[in-house]
UniProtKB/Swiss-Prot annotation:
Alphabetical list of PANTHER family matching this protein: 4FE-4S CLUSTER CONTAINING PARA FAMILY ATPASE PROTEIN
Pfam family, one: CbiA
Protein name: Uncharacterized protein MJ0579
GO molecular function list: ATP binding
Keyword annotations: ATP-binding, Nucleotide-binding
Taxonomic superkingdom: Archaea
UniProt similarity note: To M.jannaschii MJ0578.
Chain sites annotated for binding ATP: 12-19, 130-137
Amino acid sequence: MSEMMIVAVTGGKGGTGKSTLSANLFFYFIENYKTALIDCDVETPNLPYLTGCEDLFLAREVFIEVPNIEEGKTYNYNNVCKEGALLKVGDKLIFIEDLCSGCKACGINSNITFKKKSIGKIYEKKFDNGYLIVGKSNLGERKTAKIVTETKKYGLSKNCEINIVDTAAGTHCNVVRALINADKVLIVTEPTPFGVSDAKRIIKVVEKLNIPYKIVLNRYGISDLKIGYNFKIPYDKRIVECYCKGESFLKYNDLRNYIEEIANWIIWG
């Protein structure tokens, strides 16, 4: 294992159990390794609940810079906004703040000035041998890319031996941002038609990024659907009970074995 291992846990669709896997891997690793659990699902972070840690403290706020358009002022706008956040109507420049990503391209060769806008926050919880780092977008915020980037950056700044990055579901840009620079990827799926279909999509993304990956079949046993996998986690009532309580299921030795098998691949390959 390298000095700093980054493993991303992802899945093509929501609800497959990737965050449950991330949380239990975290509790397994902190027994012997300094570990960071980084929640990059910034629009719907749920690792605080799955780890029983709702008492996080605010580590930092995430800002972007947006145009400061003043009423009655004339601007020599360069018409480069790909998001459509700036519209020229006659001599008037209209700014639609919700569409702005903060790229500041509109300020090139222009008299447009900028102001800070808060788009989200990063929260932290310290454990004896690790950290839970959680990015969370402000309510209604549409442009959340920088929150993902800053959350991951802040988590990695803790210099932990193991870094578990929990991504959002899907194959969109924020998922890619969370996956970039990972040493290994765990793709979590389930034996359902949607699970198989969406797993194929995220596999293509991970292969494009050229990152080694393994497939974890969660809820093994709920159907006879055939799907290739490397590791499995069975459908078990005890896992559901632990999930609802925000607890790890590692206390059950037979279930712990499934996590240990995955952890061994992360550490030893």
